[in-house]
Structure formats: structure tokens, C-alpha cells
């Protein structure tokens, strides 16, 4: 995103060029489209919508030039607003419709699908009123989606979600947190079969999925980097073993309250790190070391784990931290894991030994 300071410099340059070219602005409609869009980049989305109503010239300029819009500020009548705006803003690539209270209905999502065919990033979180009809509409009209947030959407089925994946095959980021009824093993099988570019998936609180679903996901989405299985209470070590073996680029794994997880899962993660060290060395040569290896792991409330198994993971992946301010290895509720420590503690101990405090 271009900074506000850089945009202001561009505006000043535009004004200077207009002076040199003798451009006269006597009415609002005379403002050049390029200048108008630079001005609108400095204001909030509500003002952009108002600007599109000033005159037909501004409406057309905004319609063709606006690629990102958020209506999250709209606390009521969002559905009507979307119905009004969707036919006008046909070049949108990012649309944020996050709600505090559910407002959106199927007809608004259908309008988006009918008009916004270039959409790549869509946030429909907490749209608990939308049903299967919305997902079928998106599958028909928004096949370029790479990022989709459906968290908190509780009124559609796994059949509709599976159908969506067959048409939105470019998805890289998918948030299904809390979509309890829609996320089943069949859903994960469909995602694995159709969305092999997927890199981030949130399945938090989707308590109906089992190892079968996660294994299908692991085999079908080898580029997976972030996976949240928070409170997926049915999964066992088999899921983690499959992820460790198949998803070698995994960076973040959430296993909060997955109480069937044991040491076997931890050792499989550690072994995958050792086995894939050649990938890490390849990244080092490219100057991308920070991008390789597990960097975030949440095993809170996984009470079957022992210190030795978790320490093996921590030793294998030095980006996992237990030290203050850098908690990327989260172990809340696991009192028996208090002895697990990251490399920073050993380094601090060595420093203290080499440079002891002077006597007073």
C-alpha cells in the first residue's frame, strides 16, 4: 500500500503539471480522473461512496478505478447498501463486509457474484444469515477468489461448501472458524481435491472433523503453511503425522484443546524438521531462512504431552520461543511442560556465565 505521504507528493506533482499545462477546473466534473482517484485514496470508504454520487463523471471514475472497499463501518442497512453498490463497483478486487451483528442476506451476496467478477479477497465473517444460495452464487460468479473469510457463518451446509471449492480453485487463504455444520470430513476432502494452492486454513471450533478429513487435506494441499485446528476434539496423532510428512512448508499449527494429541505427534513434527533440513538450507542460500520451519505452535490444554517430546520440537525449530515477549510456543494449561525452553534461555545462560555481574 502506498503511504499517505507518498500519495500527497503525487497529488502535488499532479497539481504542478496541471498548472504547467494550463488546465482549468471550473466545476467538480472537470477534475481529471487520475487526480480524483489519488484524492479518494486519502479518504475513508464512506467518503468514496458519497463522492461516487456527486455527478455521473465521478460515478464512472470511481466505478472503473475503485479496487478495494470496506463496509465494516456500516452498522445497519448493509444489505441494502451492497445491493445498491455492487452494480456500480464492478472492478472491486477486495471487499470487506465484516459485521458485528448479522446483516447480509443471500440477495446481497448474489448481487456481488453477478457484478464483481474480478473479486479476489472477500470477507463475509459473521454473516450468519447467508445460506447455501450464497455459496452457489459465489461459485458461479467469483471464481477468481484467492482469499475468503466465512468465519462465524453458521447457516450453510457442507454440500454447498464442497461445491464452492470445485469452482474457486485459486483459494490460498480460507477462514472457516466456527462453521460447525459446514465443515465435515467431506468438506476437507473436497478442499484437498480442488484447492491445491491453499496456504492458510482456519478450522477452529469445527468439532465434527476427524483424522480422515485432515489427512485428505494434508495429501491434497502440500503448500499449506498455516493451519488452525483449535478445539477439533476428534483428531488424533494421525492428523499431525500426516501434516508433518506432507506439508513440509508448515509454519503455524494450532492444536489448542486437541486433547487426543500425544508425544507421537510431537516427535513426528521434530522428525519432519530434521528430514526437511535440505529445504531449509536451500532457503538459507536464497536469504529466506526466516521463512522456513515451524514458527508458531499452540498446544494449550494438550495434557498428554511430556516435556521431552515438546522439547524435541523446540530444539528442531529455533523460531519457536517460550521466552518472555516472544511466545510462539503456547502451552497454557500444561503445567507439566514448564521445563520446556527455547534456545534463547540457553544463550542467556551462556552470556551470564561468560560475562558475570561485577562484584559490589
UniProtKB/Swiss-Prot annotation:
Q: Which residues form the F-box domain?
A: 25-76
UniProt GO BP? heat acclimation; negative regulation of lateral root development; proteolysis involved in protein catabolic process
InterPro entries the UniProt entry points to: F-box-like_dom_sf, F-box_dom, Leu-rich_rpt, Leu-rich_rpt_Cys-con_subtyp, LRR_dom_sf
Cite the repeat ranges for LRR. Answer: 77-99, 101-126, 127-152, 153-178, 180-205, 206-231, 232-257, 258-301, 302-333
What Pfam families does this protein map onto?
F-box, LRR_6
Entry superkingdom: Eukaryota
Q: Which UniProt keywords apply?
A: Leucine-rich repeat, Repeat
Quote the function comment for this protein: Component of SCF(SKP2B) E3 ubiquitin ligase complexes, which mediate the ubiquitination and subsequent proteasomal degradation of the cyclin-dependent kinase inhibitor KRP1. Does not interact with auxin.
Q: What is this protein called?
A: F-box protein SKP2B
Organism for this UniProt entry: Arabidopsis thaliana (Mouse-ear cress)
Q: Which gene encodes it?
A: SKP2B
Amino acid at each position: 500500500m502506498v503511504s499517505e505521504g507518498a500519495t500527497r507528493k503525487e497529488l502535488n506533482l499532479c497539481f504542478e503539471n496541471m498548472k504547467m499545462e494550463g488546465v482549468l477546473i471550473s466545476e467538480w466534473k472537470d477534475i481529471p480522473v487520475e487526480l480524483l482517484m489519488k484524492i479518494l485514496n486519502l479518504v475513508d470508504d464512506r467518503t468514496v461512496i458519497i463522492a461516487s454520487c456527486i455527478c455521473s463523471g465521478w460515478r464512472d471514475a470511481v466505478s472503473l478505478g475503485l479496487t478495494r472497499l470496506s463496509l465494516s463501518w456500516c452498522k445497519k442497512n448493509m444489505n441494502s447498501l451492497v445491493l445498491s453498490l455492487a452494480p456500480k463497483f464492478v472492478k472491486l478486487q477486495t471487499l470487506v463486509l465484516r459485521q458485528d451483528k448479522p446483516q447480509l442476506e443471500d440477495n446481497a451476496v448474489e448481487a456481488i457474484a453477478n457484478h464483481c467478477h474480478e473479486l479476489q479477497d472477500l470477507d463475509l465473517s459473521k454473516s450468519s444469515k447467508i445460506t447455501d444460495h450464497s455459496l452457489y452464487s459465489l461459485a458461479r460468479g467469483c471464481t477468481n477468489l484467492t482469499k475468503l473469510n466465512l468465519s462465524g457463518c453458521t447457516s450453510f451446509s457442507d454440500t454447498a461448501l464442497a461445491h464452492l471449492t470445485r469452482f474457486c480453485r485459486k483459494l490460498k487463504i480460507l477462514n472457516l472458524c466456527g462453521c460447525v455444520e459446514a465443515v465435515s470430513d467431506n468438506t476437507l476432502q473436497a478442499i484437498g481435491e480442488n484447492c491445491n494452492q491453499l496456504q492458510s486454513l482456519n478450522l477452529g471450533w469445527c468439532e465434527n472433523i476427524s483424522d480422515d478429513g485432515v489427512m485428505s487435506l494434508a495429501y491434497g494441499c502440500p503448500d499449506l503453511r498455516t493451519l488452525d485446528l483449535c478445539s477439533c476434539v476428534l483428531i488424533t496423532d494421525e492428523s499431525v503425522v500426516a501434516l508433518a510428512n506432507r506439508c513440509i512448508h508448515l509454519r503455524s499449527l494450532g492444536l489448542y484443546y486437541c486433547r487426543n494429541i500425544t508425544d507421537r505427534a510431537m516427535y513426528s513434527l521434530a522428525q519432519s524438521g530434521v528430514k526437511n533440513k535440505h529445504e531449509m538450507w536451500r532457503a538459507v542460500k536464497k536469504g529466506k531462512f526466516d521463512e522456513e520451519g515451524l514458527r508458531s505452535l499452540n498446544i494449550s490444554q494438550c495434557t498428554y504431552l511430556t516435556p521431552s517430546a515438546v522439547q524435541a520440537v523446540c530444539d528442531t525449530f529455533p523460531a519457536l520461543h517460550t521466552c518472555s515477549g516472544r511466545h510462539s510456543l503456547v502451552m497454557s494449561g500444561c503445567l507439566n511442560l514448564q521445563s520446556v525452553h527455547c534456545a534463547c534461555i540457553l544463550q542467556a545462560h551462556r552470556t551470564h556465565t561468560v560475562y558475570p555481574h561485577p562484584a559490589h
